Amino acid sequence: MVVAMDQRTNVNGDPGAGDRKKEERFDPSAQPPFKIGDIRAAIPKHCWVKSPLRSMSYVVRDIIAVAALAIAAVYVDSWFLWPLYWAAQGTLFWAIFVLGHDCGHGSFSDIPLLNSVVGHILHSFILVPYHGWRISHRTHHQNHGHVENDESWVPLPERVYKKLPHSTRMLRYTVPLPMLAYPLYLCYRSPGKEGSHFNPYSSLFAPSERKLIATSTTCWSIMFVSLIALSFVFGPLAVLKVYGVPYIIFVMWLDAVTYLHHHGHDEKLPWYRGKEWSYLRGGLTTIDRDYGIFNNIHHDIGTHVIHHLFPQIPHYHLVDATKAAKHVLGRYYREPKTSGAIPIHLVESLVASIKKDHYVSDTGDIVFYETDPDLYVYASDKSKIN
């Protein structure tokens, strides 16, 4: 096993202190003493049951809420209230995304046609190519925690990081710019990777999936053209107020939540390569989060560890499944910090992580994020130092 990690020894004069420290210290990169089958066996049977009616009830709930908010905002049309509308509607757009995400996993129902139709409607409405994103997200789940093969917010190897222009590094690691990256990711993927979620011939997809990608790109295009048509009818400002700004809020939710589920824990968590990676070890690097009042609105997306290991579990069973699995996971499960009504504490975790988690070593089968000490030292400051 090759580990790229600082090793610190305790030298305080107490001959027994080192042993006690070793016993107390938990190594999150150590092989877990359980198998994924042990976790599966601990999850109650009802957690695996998918109800199309229950899933559709959440769709109806969210669509009614989105429509009601839009109608109310247009009717009142007050610049004092528009910011409240943007925040609320953008949050609901994110909730709609989560339901479409469930369709992509097949946790929405056991009916593939229903999953595909509902998924296309929901994701196209918020300008997400359903099959394109579904397939790349499947790759993310199948390779979670793998430095090279993971797909979402994958860490950059040092050699790739060092080749990026300083301006690109600043864009990637200066808040809030990374929280606006999703549309670019759909078009170009992440640094070090190539392909588009819209192109049927992208390296993201197998030849057998090209028709699916073409279908989703067509649905996306219909929505995009519809927005342009609406801007001619009602004016660009009206479309921007009703749809455009909430879309930006949705993108920020998506990027922030996705990032926080794989970064920003108080202790450094491992990323794997080669023989050290396994589906279980990669999944155990994910992090649960408490989003306060948004937990229910966002369909319990914060219960992320069990979701990553068993994406076929419906979102409305994830809380029960997580509670049941904790005794098996032990210290490999990191209890999320309890949130107030608004999860302000997560902003601190997000900013701190972006400022220090920049790249991983080019070598080693178990690696941890490292910090570029010169990233925020601008050219003028560097010249003074030199």
UniProtKB/Swiss-Prot annotation:
CDD domains: Delta12-FADS-like (cd03507). GO terms for cellular component: endoplasmic reticulum; endoplasmic reticulum membrane. It is found in: Endoplasmic reticulum membrane. Its EC number is 1.14.19.25. Keywords: Endoplasmic reticulum, Fatty acid biosynthesis, Fatty acid metabolism, Lipid biosynthesis, Lipid metabolism, Membrane, Oxidoreductase, Transmembrane, Transmembrane helix. It is a multi-pass membrane protein. A motif (Histidine box-1) lies at residues 101-105. Residues 1-30 are annotated as: Disordered. Residues 17-27 have a biased composition (Basic and acidic residues). InterPro entries: FA_desaturase_dom, FAS_N, Fatty_acid_desaturase. It comes from the Eukaryota. GO terms for biological process: unsaturated fatty acid biosynthetic process. GO terms for molecular function: acyl-lipid omega-3 desaturase (cytochrome b5) activity; omega-3 fatty acid desaturase activity. The chain crosses the membrane at residues 63-83, 220-240, 242-262. Pfam families: DUF3474 (PF11960), FA_desaturase (PF00487). Abundant in leaves and seedlings. Barely detectable in root tissue. Pathway: Lipid metabolism; polyunsaturated fatty acid biosynthesis. It catalyses: a (9Z,12Z)-octadecadienoyl-containing glycerolipid + 2 Fe(II)-[cytochrome b5] + O2 + 2 H(+) = (9Z,12Z,15Z)-octadecatrienoyl-containing glycerolipid + 2 Fe(III)-[cytochrome b5] + 2 H2O. A motif (Histidine box-2) lies at residues 137-141. A motif (Histidine box-3) lies at residues 304-308. Microsomal (ER) omega-3 fatty acid desaturase introduces the third double bond in the biosynthesis of 18:3 fatty acids, important constituents of plant membranes. It is thought to use cytochrome b5 as an electron donor and to act on fatty acids esterified to phosphatidylcholine and, possibly, other phospholipids. The histidine box domains may contain the active site and/or be involved in metal ion binding. Belongs to the fatty acid desaturase type 1 family. This is Acyl-lipid omega-3 desaturase (cytochrome b5), endoplasmic reticulum. It comes from Arabidopsis thaliana.
